[in-house]
Amino acid sequence: MSTIRCDIVSAEQEIFHGEATFVVATGELGELGIAPKHAPLITRLKPGKVVITTVNGEQLDFAISGGILEVQPQVVTILADSAIRADTIDEVAVRKAKEEAERILANRGETIDVAKAQQQLVEAVVQMQALERLRRTVKH
């Protein structure tokens, strides 16, 4: 079975390093599927999910808040603004962050940072979607 090395890193830490048979991420122009020996590519990533299929067939789900994806013949590198494995997401904290961002955006005043609140909302929604996908996968 052919594999490709995959690395996911954020400003804070290395999130994943290992061999994969397939990687899925959301680029600016849509969803990308990357298999071993994929043509070289570089693109910006939208906030969303990254799914890595490991050599044993396991699917690992990650939530990212955006970043850059680079594909070389033997390696896929994802430089994420922030990234988290779906199975480590704190659902209560994410729900609170989402509610707080929505509250801030609903009560816009001159002193709030709208872009920051919007980014927090996007990150919370992406993490909740990753949790939901993980739950569906575990049930099957």
Curated annotation (Swiss-Prot):
One of its GO terms (cellular component) is proton-transporting ATP synthase complex. It is a peripheral membrane protein. The keyword Metal-binding does not apply. It is found in: Cell inner membrane. Pfam families: ATP-synt_DE (PF00401), ATP-synt_DE_N (PF02823). The keyword Transcription regulation does not apply. Belongs to the ATPase epsilon chain family. This is ATP synthase epsilon chain. It comes from Xylella fastidiosa (strain Temecula1 / ATCC 700964).
